[in-house]
Regions:
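Bacterial N-terminal signal peptides that target proteins for export
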Residues: 19-31
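Bacterial N-terminal signal peptides
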Residues: 29-40
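Metallo-beta-lactamase
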Residues: 45-56, 89-91, 97-99, 151-282, ...
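Conserved beta-strand hairpin/beta-sheet module of binuclear metal-dependent hydrolase folds
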Residues: 58-108, 213-215, 219-224
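Active-site neighborhood of phospho(di)ester-bond hydrolases with catalytic His/Asp-centered motifs
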Residues: 93-95, 118-126, 144-147, 222-224, ...
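Active-site HxH/HxHxD metal-binding segment of metal-dependent hydrolases
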Residues: 107-186
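Accessory terminal helices/loops
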Residues: 253-258, 266-335
Length: 335
């Protein structure tokens, strides 16, 4: 199925309405497949990726994936993961893109502790966040997710498995999409696992049901795909920059000392603000406002094509114009 990105000018209310209707006719299946169709972000840094745990703070670790596209070389682990070591076992944050890549994450954990993975928490519903669930569940781990996350996982499972197979091929063998054993209702949950407290907060930023996980005792937040650093974030058709901006304000209120972003190196809140929070605000204040004013789409995209504060980010040239396009169409349809 071909998904067309709209670029025509807005010269009248009639043409604006036609574009809105075209946008609304894009099927759910096409939207769920959009990450595979839209972006080609391969890079040399993917080559021979082996997950390695890096200490964030006492007993809390991050596994930082490469910034490029899913590939055989990175086993679909082009995202960030994390884990917390407790006396009762390991709490893993996100399970990987397949049974194969889940085993790679398990190996990275085993390099720093003999404790088994007892719990898995899914921060989101993109393939590399949860398609390793079954691997860990079959080994006795208890998988947790918020209800909204599970809903999106169920809707996208079939398309994500076939889509990931196009990138990693035979590495998908033995992978079964499996949702959480423990599903938590509501937009915010407080959990106590292995003596560690977790504040689990819905963001619905990059994907519906995306979340962030805050560890108040450690002053660390695993943001999921709310925050990107070192590379430009991607706005998908199902992304919601207004919710993302609100969720980022909640992150600011949590005021973590350390941030483990969805993509990019472990960082602090100031850098997360500069490379993600400011970009959400840029899109809303400039592209969103122009759409509400029924300004010309093409003129708006040209006007804001080269914001200096974001041009240094990897993937800027590939993603920025498409991001603006989707935000314009969204605000035009939902002013």
């Amino acid at each position: 199925m071909c998904v067309r990105v709209l670029t025509s000018d807005v010269s009248s209310t009639e043409s604006a309405n036609m574009r809105i209707q075209t946008f609304k006719r894009v099927s759910l299946k096409a939207l769920l497949m959009m990450p595979f169709l839209a972006f080609n972000l391969g890079q040399a840094s993917d080559t021979n990726f082996a997950p390695k745990a890096q200490l964030v703070i006492d007993k809390v670790y991050a596994i930082v994936g490469p910034l490029g596209q899913r590939s055989v070389a990175n086993a679909g682990l082009n995202a960030n993961y994390g884990f917390v070591i407790t006396e009762n076992g390991v709490i893993l944050i996100d399970s990987g893109a397949s049974a194969h890549s889940a085993a790679m994450l398990e190996k990275a954990v085993a390099e720093v502790t003999k404790q088994p993975v007892r719990w898995v928490l899914n921060t989101g519903s993109q393939d590399h966040r949860w398609l390793g669930n079954d691997y860990f569940a079959r080994k006795g781990a208890q998988v947790h997710a918020l209800a909204a996350t599970v809903q999106t996982q169920k809707a996208s499972a079939e398309q994500q498995v076939s889509g990931m197979a196009r990138f990693v091929g035979d590495q998908m063998k033995g992978t079964s999409p499996r949702q959480a054993d423990v599903v938590h209702p509501g937009a915010e949950v407080t959990l106590q696992l292995g003596g560690i407290q977790f504040q689990w907060i819905d963001t619905s930023a990059h994907y519906p049901g995306d979340t962030m996980i805050h560890l108040p005792q450690k002053s660390v937040t695993f943001t999921g795909d709310l925050v990107y650093v070192d590379r430009l974030l991607g706005v998908l058709p199902q992304s919601n920059v207004r919710k993302a901006n609100q969720a980022f304000e909640r992150l600011r209120a949590l005021s973590p000392a350390l941030v483990v972003p969805g993509h990019g190196q472990v960082t602090n809140l100031a850098k997360a603000q500069k490379e993600t929070g400011d970009y959400y605000q840029f899109l809303i204040a400039n592209i969103g406002v122009a759409a509400r004013n029924l300004d010309s789409m093409s003129e708006t995209l040209d006007k804001f094509a080269s914001p200096l504060q974001f041009k240094h980010l990897q993937n800027f040239e590939e993603l920025h114009r498409g991001n603006m396009n989707r935000v314009f169409v969204d605000f035009e349809a939902n002013p």
